[in-house]
A protein has these predicted regions:
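A contiguous pocket-lining binding segment that forms or flanks enzyme active sites
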Residues: 77-131
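Active-site beta-loop-alpha junctions enriched in small/polar residues
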Residues: 27-31, 55-59, 79-81, 100-101, ...
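Glycine-rich phosphate-binding active-site loops on the catalytic face of alpha/beta enzymes
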Residues: 1, 78, 94-106, 147-168
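Catalytic cores of alpha/beta
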Residues: 35-39, 63, 81-91, 136-151
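Alpha-helix-loop-beta-strand connector modules within alpha/beta enzyme cores
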Residues: 9-24, 61-74, 110-130, 173-184
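Active-site beta->alpha loop and helix N-cap motifs at the rims of alpha/beta catalytic domains
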Residues: 1-66, 70, 100
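C-terminal alpha-helical cap/extension of soluble enzyme domains
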Residues: 121-184
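Hydrophobic faces of well-ordered beta-strands that scaffold small-molecule active sites
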Residues: 22-28, 50-54, 72-77, 96-98, ...
Length: 184
């Protein structure tokens, strides 16, 4: 947020890669095949942890196929159907990102889509990982775990929500009260 200019964005990606020990998705902005290839190769060259994030459109699927052939890992994003997820996997995507919250926003079941994709990949033996995106709350995280999503991108508030439980709070309060009674 607040990072302007391509060079500053790319420096920011490298900074993130130096902090986290895992994959970092970096999104292409181009929507044409040639532009996606150019941007994706530049992004992939920044750091081995970079995964090139490509939109799930016809040109994006072609780009995923190209990147897969070059050993460049990809995240096919803006996935809203099992058909899109199938094409991404067939093209060799490393990750596919179904958008849970955005589907829920239009009265479709985002978690059901994640479950359908997980089941389809297992049935057909695809190695593409399901990266649940557009997670809005703690229940989404737990539901994604229950249906077998491999990864989820989550807001910090939802992650913190995993710690919250009223019995933990009341139990801790009781422990501390008991401790004070015994130890003054």
């Amino acid at each position: 947020e607040g990072i302007k200019g391509v060079e500053n964005q790319r420096k920011h990606y490298v900074d993130i890669c130096n902090i986290v020990q895992g994959d970092v998705s970096a999104e292409v902005i181009a929507t044409d095949y040639e532009g996606m290839i150019k941007e994706g190769e530049e992004l992939a060259a920044l750091n081995p942890h970079i995964v090139v994030k490509v939109p799930c459109i016809a040109e994006g699927i072609k780009a995923v196929k190209y990147f897969s052939g070059k050993g460049i890992r990809t995240n096919c994003t803006l996935v809203f159907s099992a058909g899109q997820a199938l094409l991404a996997a067939k093209a060799g995507a490393t990750y596919v990102s179904p958008f849970v919250g955005r589907l829920d926003d239009i009265c479709e079941d985002g978690i059901a889509l994640v479950a359908k994709i997980v089941e389809m990949y297992r049935y057909y033996g695809y190695t593409t990982q399901v990266l649940a995106a557009s997670i809005r709350h703690t229940a989404h995280i737990m539901q994604c775990i229950e249906v077998g999503a491999d990864v989820a991108t989550c807001p910090l508030s939802a992650i913190k929500g995993l710690l919250n439980h009223p019995l933990t709070d009341s139990g801790l309060k009781k422990f501390l009260e008991d401790y004070k009674c015994v130890n003054g």
